[in-house]
Each structure stands twice: as C-alpha cells, then as structure tokens.
Amino acid sequence: MLAKRIIPCLDVRDGQVVKGVQFRNHEIIGDIVPLAKRYAEEGADELVFYDITASSDGRVVDKSWVSRVAEVIDIPFCVAGGIKSLEDAAKILSFGADKISINSPALADPTLITRLADRFGVQCIVVGIDTWYDAETGKYHVNQYTGDESRTRVTQWETLDWVQEVQKRGAGEIVLNMMNQDGVRNGYDLEQLKKVREVCHVPLIASGGAGTMEHFLEAFRDADVDGALAASVFHKQIINISELKTYLATQGVEIRIC
C-alpha cells in the first residue's frame, strides 16, 4: 500500500502567501520561501502552490519564487496558476517544480490536459477541481476562475462528470477543492469525496475543511483518499505536521514518518 500524503497548500497572490474562507476575503499569511522551508522541515510529503489570480489576470506563475522554493526544499512540489500552454508548463518545470496543476484553463480548453500529459507524462499533470455543493439542487458543480471573486462562475459541468472527463484526457492526479468547506475547518466533505472516489481511478487529494487531526483520519479511512491537503491549520500552527503523522500512524494509517 502506498503511503498517504500530507500536503500543505500555499495560495500565492502578489508574491505572498494568503488564505481566505470559501475562496473569499483573503488575508496575508507571510512570505513564500520561509513557509515552504518550515513545512518541508516539519515532514510534509509534498507542497502545492496556487497563484490564485494568475488565470484571471491572464498571466503565468512568477519564476522568481518558484526557483527560490526549489533551492530550499527537498520534497516534491506542485505549482498552479495560469498554465495555458505546453510552453508555460515547460517553463515552470524548468524552474524546479515537480508537477504542474491546471484548473480554469482546463475548463476553457480540455484538450490542454491531453497535450500536457503526452508531452510531460501523466505523473506530473494534476487537475484541480473547484467544486461547490448547491443545496437547492443537491448537486455538485464545477466553478471556474475562483481566484477572483468578481470573475468566479459556475460552469455547465457537474463535478462527477468532470472528474471522469479529466481522467479520460490524461489527468494523473486530481485535487478536489471543496469550496463549501474551504477555510471553515469543520471537516472534509466526506459524502462528496466518497462519490468522487467511486469514479476516480487516479490519485485523489482532498482539499477544504481540515480543522482537526481526526478530520485527516476520516478522509483517509472513510473516503480512501490518497492525500489530504490543508492550509489554515498549518499556517496558523493549529496542527503540527510531524505530530499529525504520528497520530495517523497510531490509528493505522500508512504514512511516512520523518
């Protein structure tokens, strides 16, 4: 059995790490490189960086901080933000990133997933899916351009359909960003994760809602996700990664202990 992964997420805007609640009202957390270094030293398995306004601004991720992160950490890291072409992806990988993640650009042009997978290999192509639960209809819908509140829109895709579509097109991993849960720290949406797990045959990463160590355990044990991504609990030092991993190991979760 492959070890489960603990993945801190760093949302980047204007060269700094920020964090919002349900993708809104972002506050500044701190500088990118020191945070990345701290998480690597605490025992994170991987880091994910989202330049949250790159897609809506029509630009690609800034090279300067990607290169600096690559210099100070020795764990894999994934970068997302405005990647719309093979050239964009090649640049970011050349800066030192191990994986690239696409989200809004994939919705605009789904063939991008296949072209990236063919060029760089499925192992480094992650598709992020921003999913919102509509209580009125009881359905999960995919959102686009969520880094900019003024441009965020609900797409025609239902989440389960899009999960299947991106796999057909070559996604090597899926990060499910559950917007309703984002930043509120009351647990991952296990119901949604279980439904997605049934149709997701590539590594699935849960994102949105972690507030306690038990929430991570539930995601691994009850929804069988491959990794759990979180931001607030790590940024605010509510949970220490090393202590979290020790706890999970005592609960029978296969995890890499540093």
From Swiss-Prot:
Membrane-spanning ranges: none
SUPFAM superfamilies the record matches: Ribulose-phoshate binding barrel (SSF51366)
GO cellular component annotations of the record: cytoplasm
Catalytic activity: 5-[(5-phospho-1-deoxy-D-ribulos-1-ylimino)methylamino]-1-(5-phospho-beta-D-ribosyl)imidazole-4-carboxamide + L-glutamine = D-erythro-1-(imidazol-4-yl)glycerol 3-phosphate + 5-amino-1-(5-phospho-beta-D-ribosyl)imidazole-4-carboxamide + L-glutamate + H(+)
Metabolic or biological pathway: Amino-acid biosynthesis; L-histidine biosynthesis; L-histidine from 5-phospho-alpha-D-ribose 1-diphosphate: step 5/9
A single MF term (Gene Ontology): imidazoleglycerol-phosphate synthase activity
Subcellular location: Cytoplasm
Leading EC class: lyase
EC number: 4.3.2.10
InterPro entries given in the database record: Aldolase_TIM, His_biosynth, HisF, IGPS_HisA/HisF, RibuloseP-bd_barrel
Residues at the active site: D11, D130
Key words of the record: Amino-acid biosynthesis, Cytoplasm, Histidine biosynthesis, Lyase
GO biological process, one term: L-histidine biosynthetic process
Chain's role: IGPS catalyzes the conversion of PRFAR and glutamine to IGP, AICAR and glutamate. The HisF subunit catalyzes the cyclization activity that produces IGP and AICAR from PRFAR using the ammonia provided by the HisH subunit.
Recorded family membership: Belongs to the HisA/HisF family.
Assembly, per entry: Heterodimer of HisH and HisF.
Entry protein name: Imidazole glycerol phosphate synthase subunit HisF
